[in-house]
Regions:
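Glycine-rich nucleotide cofactor-binding entry segment
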Residues: 1-168, 200-205, 249-271
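A structural alpha-helix within SAM-dependent methyltransferase catalytic domains
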Residues: 117, 207, 211-214
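Helix-to-beta-strand junctions that scaffold the AdoMet/dcAdoMet cofactor pocket
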Residues: 121, 217-218
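Mobile active-site "lid"/loop adjacent to the S-adenosyl-L-methionine
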Residues: 134, 174-209, 224, 228-235
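Conserved Class I S-adenosyl-L-methionine
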Residues: 236-254
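Core SAM-dependent methyltransferase catalytic element
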Residues: 273-275, 280-292
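Conserved small/polar residues in nucleotide/adenosyl-binding loops
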Residues: 297-307
Length: 308
């Protein structure tokens, strides 16, 4: 493992570092959640290989070495979605209203999109966007398999989306591209490609995405900002930018089992493999306040989307 990364994590975790290092040598955990739109259930699954998730309804951990749920016919029918446990916690940290207009900015492969859109009614709208054409194709497949009728997949640069969705969304999910430190146990490539230069490059990209998200968020709208990395540059430093420069209000996230507070910040969430059944994750909730300085018209979806 990269020595600089080790030094940074030792400074961050202090006495918890040995437990964290040990957890990196253990096998990752897999999980899934049921599709409420198709009345998914575990009735016809082998419950011997399943463990109920402690705080997410209709979600389960499973023994992937002995039970290949990704090859089960129910998966191809969209009765459940397989998602990494910590990533599943992101969209679960906020309650969505049935008629919310929601944007998932960097949505592929679609776990957060499907989880959220299944909670919306026909009065709500989910725009699931990914700038990468190949990943947007995978996103479309997962949205179709899940049976979402209130979801539109776009393949666009968020800067372009700003022109059509200014002050439009009630809630935005920004699971930002990151240096992937939280995936070291799961992906060898994340370990091999890590560098401090990559951390700084990702932080720059994230800042631009945050600015786009702010423009597209309604007054009093809420942004879920998340990454699967540990660096302060990509997490708490970005939150400071949003609260100080953009004057957004940082909301406190209710801590669930396995969630830790952020670095010198009790309102955000950090997740580590030695504390929960999942990989690394950072989550923050922020509300936009413009004090009436920004006016907007909540356009009907088809009037806006026809220009994309």
């Amino acid at each position: 493992m990269n020595k600089l990364f080790e030094q940074r994590m030792q400074k961050l975790l202090q006495n918890d570092y040995p437990a964290f290092e040990s957890a990196l040598n253990q096998k990752p955990i897999k999980s899934f959640y049921l599709n409420p739109l198709k009345h998914g259930s575990i009735e016809h699954l082998n419950s011997a290989f399943l463990t109920k998730h402690p705080y997410i309804n209709d979600a389960y951990f499973y023994d992937y070495e002995n039970y290949q749920l990704g090859k089960h016919p129910y998966f191809n029918c969209g009765l459940y979605y397989i998602q990494e446990p910590s990533a599943m916690a992101v969209a679960n940290c906020l309650d969505f209203d049935h008629d919310d207009y929601v944007l998932d900015m960097c949505a592929a492969p679609g776990g957060k999109t499907c989880f959220t859109a299944s909670k919306l009614s026909s009065a709500g709208l989910m725009i699931a966007n990914d700038i990468n054409k190949l990943r947007a194709g995978i996103l479309s497949e997962n949205v179709e398999r899940f049976g979402l009728q209130n979801t539109i997949v776009t393949n666009s640069d968020p800067v372009k989306l700003e022109k059509y969705f200014n002050n439009f969304f009630d809630k935005i999910i920004l699971d930002a591209p990151c240096s992937g430190e939280g995936m070291f146990r799961k992906l060898d490539q994340a370990v091999e490609t890590w560098s401090i230069e990559k951390v700084n490059e990702c932080a720059y990209i994230q800042r631009n995405l945050i600015n786009s998200a702010y423009q597209m968020l309604k007054d009093e709208g809420i942004l879920i900002y998340s990454t699967c990395t540990y660096s302060l540059e990509e997490n708490e430093d970005q939150v400071k930018y949003m609260t100080n420069d953009l004057q957004m209000e940082l909301l406190e996230i209710k801590k669930q089992p396995g969630m830790a507070s952020g670095y010198q910040n009790d309102k955000v969430v950090r997740m580590y493999p030695h504390l929960n059944k999942g990989e690394g994750q950072f989550i923050a909730l922020l509300k936009k306040h413009t004090n009436g300085s920004v006016s907007y018209t909540h356009l009907r979806a088809h009037e806006t989307l026809r220009h994309l």
